[in-house]
Amino acid sequence: MAASALRGLAVAGGGESSESEDDCWEIGYLDRTSQKFKGQMLPIEEKKENFKKALTTGDVSLVQELLDSGISVDATFRYGWTPLMYAASVANAELVRVLLDRGANASFEKDKQTILITACSAHGSEEQILKCVELLLSRNADPNVACRRLMTPIMYAARDGHTQVVALLVAGGAEVNTQDENGYTALTWAARQGHKSIVLKLLELGANKMLQTKDGKLPSEIAKRNKHHEIFNLLSFTLNPLEGKLQQLTKEETICKILTTDSDRENDHIFSSYAAFGDLEVFLHGLGLEHMTDLLKERDITLRHLLTMREDEFTKNGFTSKDQQKILAALKELEVEEIQFGELSEEAKLEISGDEFLNFLLKLNKQCGHLITAVQNIITELPVNSQKIVLEWASPQNFTSVCEELVNNVEDLSEEVCNLKDLIQKLQNERENDPTHIPLRKEVSTWKSRILKRTAITVCGFGFLLFICKITFQRK
């Protein structure tokens, strides 16, 4: 039954078509006792047939016996696959080790299909794939050789969600920002498939999130198109504080870091290491002001407070004029405008004209519209459950209390606007009923005046047209 389960796994790496899977791989019971005594006497074709069956069933001891009987470790079966390539395709680390120890060529490739690519796209557990990749890298397999579609091993590992394999390949010299025939990088593949842990790891390893595909799409846009909104938000930040964190480590240090951490701890580390950076830290890192992080934390200054600071507050909290300019430029880029309602109140005086008062009301109405749009945008962007929150948040009670204050302020504003409306209506009624009031003369447009205006406009139009024509002819 184990052999039956393995039969469907012998597929060319990366989903590329290969007829090798139809290479007469018969699966059935092997009489180990008879094979042990008759191995030396079998003809070469029968030995190869038994070799294929042993590879299929993962029978390591029989593989060793057949190799001892004289069959080549790099024997090619029909369509060109070697035993090592087949062992890698089913992520059989023990079999890979035996074949490599017997001198199998780790750099073998068939039609641009390398053994390392086959291992990275294998159907198996990440633990077994990781061991196979480690063994192949130890025998100088090149992690940057691409297949016919220009996909490298790290792209296959990122596509299939193997975080530790990605990190190990980079430690082995894999290029993070290589692009395939469609312009996809490993980061683009991870974003497309929704592998958040891979995205975080690649950013940590120096992946460039601004590389576009051939159709001009960024990894963030690819994630959004495939409805991975959490990854879209993650890639839309100005700068990821983890970016390039492991680039300065040596190959040996990185391998040690990866292999001494079990998979559960590795996953915990990936998420916790990013969660340790709140929205304030991300904002400051993006502006190159990370030196202000500790100071602002000591003074309990949040990102919201920072974005609404006045000039004197910046100076009081130790920001230089250069730092202030960076923050103000970022606010302008993000289109975060501080609404100065204090200026509006100065216009509401008795001696203002009707036009000024109307402008005041229009401006107030426009600002309310902006606020409504801003709240609607926030509602649509917020994740639907707490597990999808990327950055560290403060206590939800802080948010709800502020929202309650906002509701009260909106109710007060509504009441005051109603009072203003009633007052304006009252003034209008009193003015209409005042016998001393002289109503404004309404301009009455007669048919004669309308004809005169149209005639004047037509004459001016023809005159302007003749003037243009005259200038054109003079130039010629």
UniProtKB/Swiss-Prot annotation:
Compartments in which it is found: Cytoplasm
SAM domain sequence ranges: 273-335
Keyword flag Phosphoprotein: yes
Keywords: ANK repeat, Cytoplasm, Developmental protein, Differentiation, Meiosis, Phosphoprotein, Repeat, RNA-mediated gene silencing, Spermatogenesis
Modified residues (Phosphoserine): S17, S18, S20
Listed GO biological process terms: cell differentiation; male meiotic nuclear division; regulatory ncRNA-mediated gene silencing; spermatogenesis; transposable element silencing
Keyword Repeat belongs to the record: yes
PROSITE patterns, alphabetized: ANK_REP_REGION, ANK_REPEAT
Superkingdom, taxonomy of origin: Eukaryota
Protein name stated in the entry: Ankyrin repeat, SAM and basic leucine zipper domain-containing protein 1
Organism in which the protein naturally occurs: Plecturocebus moloch (Dusky titi monkey)
